[in-house]
A protein has these predicted regions:
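Active-site beta->alpha loop and helix N-cap motifs at the rims of alpha/beta catalytic domains
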Residues: 1-85, 102
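Short, well-ordered coil/turn segments that N-cap beta-strands
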Residues: 30-33, 56-60, 88-90, 117-121, ...
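Glycine-rich phosphate-binding active-site loops on the catalytic face of alpha/beta enzymes
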Residues: 36, 96, 142-159
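Core active-site phosphate/anionic-ligand binding loop and the adjoining beta-turn-alpha structural block
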Residues: 134, 159, 167-170, 177-234
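Terminal or standalone catalytic/regulatory effector modules within metabolic enzymes
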Residues: 205-215, 219-386
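Catalytic cores of alpha/beta
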Residues: 72-84, 129-145
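Alpha-helix-loop-beta-strand connector modules within alpha/beta enzyme cores
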Residues: 1-2, 49-65, 106-123, 167-179
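Conserved, mostly hydrophobic/aromatic
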Residues: 36, 84, 92, 143, ...
Length: 386
């Protein structure tokens, strides 16, 4: 399970008791490995989730959100990896969400990490820039323990290298996986029609299926690219695609050069779209932009642009401590708010993360159970005509 540290699955930091309860229930319901990351690589935002996974005997895999910039040196990565191991992580994932890790850089990084920590190293990348298979090859030769792949119908583009290709690449070598290619072919054949359906329906956009070398210039992750394409379509501004791509690294620099991974990728991307469509930079800022520049998401590797920060948040106080230290426990309050809908413990967490969607779902679930028509029900007063 991919887990956004203190942000869990959402876009804001939650109280420690909510994080701990979510980890506990995830493991109780069958999750075994929790990949925990933070969009700032701020380890303060990871410690609660890691300790909770340790307590419940789950596998805590902590991700390094890989990115480029003069602050992101080998010394930076090895230092943070050592601290992650000391924190109690069971393994480390190099999370290359934008496909920026080049083959020979992968050799350097994996070699340095293997010399620094004893826990296993997993490499996760995307094919957006077209180099992912070569990056995996060099990483495996350098000693990486795990690589993440996707079955061929859903591979390449903003996804991962194809499983079948990597299996065949290493066949007959010391890295042979032993996987049966015939069985993999059966799996691929099963999913191929679904790919075609997704393309025909528009659920998958052909724009994100190919190689985009501009990724290496603008450092845009696959998920962020998909989101940006969708935002521009909604605004009938698809012609602004290249302008937004050029704006993204400028916004990222203003924001202290964070790695572009959820939620920072969406915050930077949405702000870049606003800057381009409004015709003036930071004329309009999202609430998430204001929160980021206020330190609510944690510490960035570089300082914010002071002029941009002043324009966006004015004299708002900037957080310098661990953001979650300012959030009182909220689990009891959340349970009290939704107690009329609670049928199982997990409902509390659904409501905590997605209150509006959860409430709509709870109403629908109850209607199905009681065989009532929600269009006739007075849900506010819990009344129904007879």
């Amino acid at each position: 399970m991919l887990f956004r540290g203190q942000n869990i699955l959402g876009y804001r930091p939650y109280a420690d008791d909510v994080v701990e309860y979510f980890v506990q229930k995830s493991l109780a319901n069958g999750i075994d490995i929790i990949r925990i990351f933070d969009c700032m690589n701020d380890l303060r935002n990871l410690q609660t989730a890691v300790h909770a996974a340790n307590k419940e005997h789950g596998h805590a895999q902590v991700a390094l959100s890989y990115t480029l910039g003069d602050a992101y040196t080998l010394e930076y990565w090895t230092s943070i990896a050592k601290r992650i191991e000391e924190m109690g992580a069971d393994s480390i994932c190099i999370k290359d969400m934008a496909g920026l890790l080049l083959p020979y850089k992968a050799t350097e990084l994996v070699t340095a990490l293997k010399e620094t920590v004893k826990i296993p190293i997993d490499l996760h990348t995307h094919y957006t820039s077209g180099v992912a298979s070569m990056t995996y090859l060099k990483a495996v030769e350098a000693g990486v323990d795990i690589i993440d792949t996707a079955m061929s119908p859903f591979a390449l583009g903003t996804s991962q290298p194809a499983t079948e290709v990597m299996v065949e690449t290493f066949r007959g070598t010391p890295y042979d996986t032993g996987y049966d290619q015939n069985l993999l072919a059966e799996i691929a054949d099963y999913f191929r029609p679904y790919r075609e359906e997704c393309l025909k329906s528009g659920l998958m956009d052909p724009k994100v299926l190919g190689v985009n070398i501009k990724t290496l210039m603008y450092q845009v992750p696959g998920g962020m690219l998909s989101n940006m394409v969708s935002q521009l379509k909604e605004q009938n501004a698809s012609d602004k695609y290249d302008d937004v791509l050029k704006e993204i690294p400028k916004v990222r620099k203003d924001f202290g050069e964070p790695p572009l991974v959820t939620p920072s990728s969406q915050i930077v991307g949405t702000q870049a779209v606003f800057n381009v469509l409004m015709g003036e930079r930071y004329k309009m800022a999202t609430d998430q932009t204001k929160d980021l520049l206020s330190g609510k998401y944690g510490r960035t590797v570089k300082p914010f642009n002071p002029e941009v920060q002043k324009k966006v948040i004015g004299d708002r106080e900037v957080i310098t401590c661990r953001p979650a230290d300012l959030i009182p426990n909220e689990l009891e309050k959340i349970e009290s708010e939704m107690k009329q809908w609670k049928q199982q413990d997990e409902d509390i967490l659904t409501y905590a993360l997605f209150p509006q969607v959860a409430t709509d779902f709870f109403k629908y679930r109850l209607a199905q159970q009681e065989k009532v028509d929600l269009k006739q029900a007075d849900t506010k007063n819990a009344a129904y005509p007879v």
